[in-house]
Amino acid sequence: MDNIKLDFQKHIDAGRCNGAEWIINHKNNIYHEVIGYKDLELKNKLKKNSYYRIWSMTKPIIGFAAMQLIEKNFLSLDDTIDKHLSDFKNLKKLSSIESNLKNTTSLENKPTVRQLLQHTAGFTYNSCDNFLAKEYEDRSLFHSASSSLEEEISKISELPLLYEPGSKWHYSISVSYTHLRAHETSQ
């Protein structure tokens, strides 16, 4: 185990990663170790069983978890997202893709769980090329390892959607909102 810890420390020291956590089961002996930082800038130490952002790699995991919740009747694909995430009860949309934050209109339909999973809920992503994505970026949404998904949902719920839910496909952060519901239900 010491060699593994030393190897990870070399990667941390070289700046290739902030930290690492591993669990090894060998001959019915469980080894669970952690080293490094959850947030390098703030020097917040990584703790065992921390939550990790693995960005797009979460999508298949979240899809699987969502299907399990649907099978157990904790979630329906046709539920509006404000049923599970009350921060989203007053969503609006931009009047046009070139709009500013003051130029919004009411939604014809609230986004659903199905639309979250299909990237058709009206959200965007800060790496996309549109006004709202720039606003996400300016507010440092989805960057900080020190802010929780709950905090980011609260911030993003204050912003309008890019377009009417269900009207088109647009890659977005929306699948992560399903993750929060899956996490809450599993507690």
Question: PLM features: what roles do these ranges have?
Answer:
Residues 32-33, 83, 133-164:
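Short, charged, amphipathic alpha-helices and their helix-cap/turn boundaries
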Residues 178-185:
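Conserved small/polar residues in nucleotide/adenosyl-binding loops
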Residues 59:
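Short, conserved phosphate/pyrophosphate- and ester-handling motifs at nucleotide-, phospho-/glycolipid
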Residues 167-172:
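Cytochrome P450
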Residues 48, 71-124, 128, 158:
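Active-site helix/loop module of the DD-peptidase/beta-lactamase fold
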